[in-house]
Amino acid sequence: QKLVYLSDELHKSFVNKYVRKIIINAYRTAGKANASCWTATQSIKDYFLYKDAKAEENPVTIVTQSTAMFLFNHKQADVEYLQQLDNLNENDIQFIIDAAQGECLLVDTTGKARVRIILLDSELDFANTNVELEKERSRRKA
């Protein structure tokens, strides 16, 4: 049985270099324990804030050693960080910048795929983040 550990907003823990070291070590060794560590954040930039840190204390290690990434919409200001990912080309980066709600670039060790997630109307009740779509849905329900 495999254990998956998902951490959201993990970058808030990166302030302390000792905590960074523990987190990075956990990500590096999880596979040996039949576990998988996942992290979620709003911007890839969060992992590049400590570029001068040693490898064992540098959060970018989590990204560069990941076997898979789901890259959803990023801001134009994040391009410089996306360009530092070896497995992305300019077309991939432009797709990520232009991605609409539910679109992402899936990158793993075997390749890349552009993914569009289409939510059912019932799923939109708890997963929608598009304010305009929510207004339209409310008008239709009324």
What are these regions (language model features)?
Residues 1-95, 121:
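Conserved P-loop NTPase motor cores
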